[in-house]
Amino acid sequence: MIKEKDIIADMHTHTTFSKHAFSSVKENINAARERKLKYIAITDHYFGNGDDIEKKNEVNRIQYLGLRINHMEPGITVIGSAEFNLGQEIYTPEKLKDLVWRPIGLHSWFVDRDNLTIDDVYNLFVEAHYNGHNAFHHIEREFHRLNHGLYSFEECMEGIKRIIDYAHDNDIWLEANESSIFENDGQSAERLCEWLKYAKEKGCKIFLGSDAHYCGEVGYFPNLIRVLNEIEYPKELILNCNRELLEKMFN
């Protein structure tokens, strides 16, 4: 049984750096403290459109989170990271080579969804792993929009299961995303619940992300706690509940 007090980390949050979120880094950190979290990952979208100033700002904000802000905030570990995008070219990747947490997900900004197939998405995730990404964000999202929305629920699930198989075989973290449930865009909640059952059978390691775009959402996982308990997902496979592993990875 997973309880709210068991969760000591939020591995997916956004701040005003993401341009469409509403809270600052400081507000998110304060919110994490209020929920008694010990770890918060700041994973603002990595836009990196090629502009020299923007490239510099993207890298600098990630490095500053870990090198400076983390040391100024006692009692909580601030993980400097970003939410990267499938199909995106990462500029100056050598400056990010020491980044421990490298999540990536499917977003419409860097791909043409209408002309993207399920196989294409699978191949993009595989390529992302080869490029050093060790966590896959919200794998249940966007599938209903691929290939002009022609895929059935069952076809989407088969594609998602292939991604899960790959993650299991290559020691990749899979995200259970709180906002996929409460937003439920195109049956994302149903796909998430379905793939979690399959991931449990495979013994996949997962992490919880609020995908907070407002500080009040940081560390708030009521829907995921309910779903994970219904499925009886093993607590030992959930990063957010594993203090020893979090310390090993981020301290």
Stretches found by the model and what they are:
Residues M1-M11, T15, V25, E94-L99, ...:
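Charged catalytic cores and adjacent phosphate/nucleic-acid-binding surfaces used
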Residues D6-I8, I40, I79, W101, ...:
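Hydrophobic "anchor" residues on beta-strands that sit immediately upstream
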Residues I8-S18, I42-F47, F136-R141, S210-A212:
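Histidine-centered catalytic micro-motifs
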Residues F17-I53:
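Metal-associated gating/positioning segment near the N- to mid-region
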Residues G48, F110-V111, Y214-G216:
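Short gly/pro/ser/thr-enriched loop/turn and capping motifs at secondary-structure boundaries
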Residues D51-A176, N229-I231, N251:
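Extended substrate/RNA-proximal surfaces in nucleic-acid metabolism proteins
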